Amino acid sequence: AFLLAATLTISSHMQEAGAVKFDIKNQCGYTVWAAGLPGGGKRLDQGQTWTVNLAAGTASARFWGRTGCTFDASGKGSCQTGDCGRQLSCTVSGAVPATLAEYTQSDQDY
């Protein structure tokens, strides 16, 4: 089973004018195909980091890990966990099973 907290480190940093940067690092002993909406997707071998820059005004984002993936040179393929429409670069949410992290930015302070 894939556990996001145990395998990927996700850190966020506020940038100029409300833009946000996420650094997603694979701390697993195996390859993970990270996915994000918005953001797409990227293969991460052990120790690799994927930086996702979200534009100012992006209200929300979600990130998850995919395992057991195979993709061809055009980015078409599939994953055993977290598959997102048989694409390397996700444009739809991942299928279960998947553990994800969500980010929402608003002016509400609770």
Swiss-Prot record:
Gene3D superfamilies xrefs: Thaumatin (2.60.110.10)
TM helices/strands, residue ranges: none
Signal peptide from the UniProt entry: 1-19
InterPro entries: Osmotin/thaumatin-like_sf (IPR037176), Thaumatin (IPR001938), Thaumatin_CS (IPR017949)
Pfam families, per the entry: Thaumatin
Species of origin: Juniperus virginiana
The keyword Signal is assigned to this record: yes
UniProt family annotation: Belongs to the thaumatin family.
Protein name: Pathogenesis-related protein
GO biological process terms, semicolon-separated: defense response
UniProt key word Isomerase: no
Keywords: Allergen, Pathogenesis-related protein, Plant defense, Signal
